Amino acid sequence: MVSFLRLAVACFAAVGALAAPVESLEERSDELFNSTLHEFAERSTPSSTGWSNGYYYSFWTDGGGSVTYTNGAAGQYSVQWSNVGNFVGGKGWNPGSARTINYGGSFNPSGNGYLAVYGWTTNPLVEYYVVESYGTYNPGSGGTYKGTVNSDGGTYNIYTATRYNAPSIIGTATFTQYWSVRTSKRTGGTVTMANHFNAWASHGMNLGTHNYQIVATEGYQSSGSSSITVY
């Protein structure tokens, strides 16, 4: 990004070369370069976690592309992203549990993205998803199929996968992923987590001590927007 911006600055400077001395052009180049970097930095929200209006939130990004995460009132949040590497963010609870979750809103990915109940446990270290909608890529296609579970008016396919030396809540680690992927996409409704936890357990997919649990938007090498409210 830096080399591209400097090239753009140089091109801009060349246009006015006949009308300005060299010192003035250098000053203008530095000002434009620094201003552009500042504007780029303002467009990207840094990774963070915490509490917002009674709900726990988590936002993580690998720093690629531009992504803006905004906490709204109560359980609402929004995300705008463009040409990202990878990010995941949303609102919910800490710790997670076998609760019944209600949510609604809009989810508009252009490319690869997920709208899911997303959480972690430790001992064992597990990253889990109950995917309600997704973009161009079905996340379950990269895992091992285990079966189905019927819940909340829909059918979910169950998968498991292993991530090696990947980012986690305890740092870079190797861990297991559990997935329930809804066969009919939706962007609002009820998710009965107990149904998924019980179905996973029936396939030997056991959870540990719950960490956070959020209704998350995730984007991977894509662009898009979402606005979600958790109840």
Curated annotation (Swiss-Prot):
Glycan attachment points: 34
Signal peptide: 1-19
InterPro entries named in the record: ConA-like_dom_sf (IPR013320), GH11/12 (IPR013319), GH11_AS_1 (IPR018208), GH11_AS_2 (IPR033119), GH11_dom (IPR033123), Glyco_hydro_11 (IPR001137)
Family annotation (SUPFAM superfamilies): Concanavalin A-like lectins/glucanases
A GO molecular-function descriptor: endo-1,4-beta-xylanase activity
Known pathway: Glycan degradation; xylan degradation
Catalytic activity: Endohydrolysis of (1->4)-beta-D-xylosidic linkages in xylans
GO biological process, one term: xylan catabolic process
PANTHER family the UniProt entry points to: ENDO-1,4-BETA-XYLANASE A-RELATED
Function comment: Endo-1,4-beta-xylanase involved in the hydrolysis of xylan, a major structural heterogeneous polysaccharide found in plant biomass representing the second most abundant polysaccharide in the biosphere, after cellulose.
Entry's family note: Belongs to the glycosyl hydrolase 11 (cellulase G) family.
Protein name, UniProt field: Probable endo-1,4-beta-xylanase A
Gene: xlnA
